[in-house]
């Protein structure tokens, strides 16, 4: 599974500005989903890869980013 890492409180994606390989996104994806996860910056959001099927990613149901 793949997807954008999401802030559970406001429903927003984690933003990033350095597209492609991005240490911040990789670190945040691994903190949330485990050391087997990958991450990079895609369309100014942190995109996480190699996730388990039940991983919660953006968008959250009933929560819109404001």
UniProtKB/Swiss-Prot annotation:
Q: Where is the signal peptide, in residue numbers? A: none
Tissue-specificity statement: Expressed by the venom gland.
Q: Which SMART domains match?
A: Knot1 (SM00505)
Please verify whether the record's keywords include Cell division: no
Q: Which domain of life is it from?
A: Eukaryota
Give GO BP annotations, semicolon-separated.
defense response
Q: Which cellular compartments is it found in?
A: Secreted
Instruction: Give yes or no: UniProt keyword Disulfide bond.
Output: yes
Q: Which residues form the LCN-type CS-alpha/beta domain?
A: 1-66
Principal subcellular localisation of the protein:
secreted
Which keywords accompany this UniProt record?
Amidation, Disulfide bond, Ion channel impairing toxin, Neurotoxin, Secreted, Toxin, Voltage-gated sodium channel impairing toxin
This entry carries the following GO cellular component terms, namely: extracellular region
Disulfide-linked positions: 12-65, 16-41, 25-46, 29-48
GO MF term list: sodium channel inhibitor activity; toxin activity
Domain characteristics, as noted in the entry: Has the structural arrangement of an alpha-helix connected to antiparallel beta-sheets by disulfide bonds (CS-alpha/beta).
Q: What does this protein do?
A: Beta toxins bind voltage-independently at site-4 of sodium channels (Nav) and shift the voltage of activation toward more negative potentials thereby affecting sodium channel activation and promoting spontaneous and repetitive firing. Acts on human sodium channel Nav1.6/SCN8A and with less activity on Nav1.5/SCN5A.
Family of this protein: Belongs to the long (4 C-C) scorpion toxin superfamily. Sodium channel inhibitor family. Beta subfamily.
Write down what this protein is called: Beta-toxin Chui5
What lineage does UniProt assign to this protein's organism? Eukaryota, Metazoa, Ecdysozoa, Arthropoda, Chelicerata
